[in-house]
Amino acid sequence: MKLRSVILPVVRMGLISLILVMGCISCNTIYTDQSDCPRGVSLMFNYNYNMEYTNSFPAKVHCVSVYVFDESGQFIGRYDETSDVLKDENYRMTLDLDAGRYTLLAYGGLACPENSFDITSYQTKASATHINDMEVNLRHNDFKSDKKLHDLFYGVEEVEVPRRDEYVKDTLYMMKNTNNIRLVLQQANGKSLEADDFVFTITDDNSCMDETNAVVSRGMVTYSPWTTGEAAVGTAEDGETPISVAFAELSTSRL
């Protein structure tokens, strides 16, 4: 009885030690099922492709969507963020992904309620959507647009998630796909102008972009001003006669 009472605690301790060791190595060995191991991508966003040459992502992008595709280009999943955490310059989006190579396709502005573009050829099943089928289309009215477009941003990044249990840090750089153009007219003789006396339009075949952000021909779109008016800009040489201008602002997809 005394020998048994000594052996049992030793056996118990041995089993506990074995369980602890197995728990420690289960996420690091290639011989075990790794589907439950924590790994993926810790993704930061950067929008410095602008005239300020600084990261304006926290100030300019109010919602972001990341579409994930595997090494063969098949759709894996989508991650959205629409909250105020995007205002934090240190914000990172966590993507839980198994080991492998992925393409991350990101759009800023699509998940916002006031968005001006739609994703087409997009389905929820990975077997149904390939990255080459992805397109973003301007929401227009019979190829006419006279609204201030909600800003659209684009970015793409290739990333590899290793087998070890960790989140790979990466940065996805974005560019802006919308423009706000202000046209100003002024008489050389200083006489006042009325904006309603003029017709302001911009035409371009630029309503659709593919997964590489290249413009795809879908037909000419006519852009009209979303606002017009007149403004005083100073006085003439006599110091009394006001000088005014007529202006119009148009919002377009990438030119």
Where are these regions (language model features)?
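Structural motif
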Residues: 47-59, 185-193
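Short, low-hydrophobicity acidic/polar segments
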Residues: 77-176
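Bacterial N-terminal signal peptides that target proteins for export
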Residues: 2-15
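Short coil/turn motif common to extracellular beta-sandwich-like domains
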Residues: 35-54, 176-180, 252
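Bacterial Sec-dependent N-terminal signal peptides
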Residues: 2-3, 20-48
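A sequence/structural signal for flexible, mid-protein segments enriched
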Residues: 142-237
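Residue-level recognition of well-ordered beta-strand positions that form the cores
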Residues: 44-48, 67, 107, 184-186, ...
